[in-house]
Amino acid sequence: TRFTVVSGGAAVKDNQTGLIWEQEPDREHDVWSRSVARCATKEVGGQKGWRAPSVDELKTLIDTSQHDPALPAGHPFSNIKSEIYWTATPDPKDDIVAWQVSFFSGEPVTDQKSGTRRMWCVLGELRK
């Protein structure tokens, strides 16, 4: 199977990428800087070292054949909203903009960092 629930149910390992995701992303909507900082101080399932995902990492969860949310069928995540989630990836052309991923459409988008979005923290490194 693609996903394995770990850390007493608090996290999910993606066996395809090697990344470990929060089983349930933040419920709070916040600006980019606070969202990124919150990941860095999180402890999930007794594990530290969480961080905000890059746009490429967050896109690995997307299943474009699914919509609302655009996640693989049978995924073990909870409280997934078909909303736009922050990534740690700033727009290299504009300091006030960062990349986000829409879990309604599955598309990456950009918006100002002053907007409020949810964050889905990750642990580990993406296997190439």
What are these regions (language model features)?
Residues 1-51, 55-128:
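Glycine-aromatic-enriched surface loops/turns that form tight recognition elements
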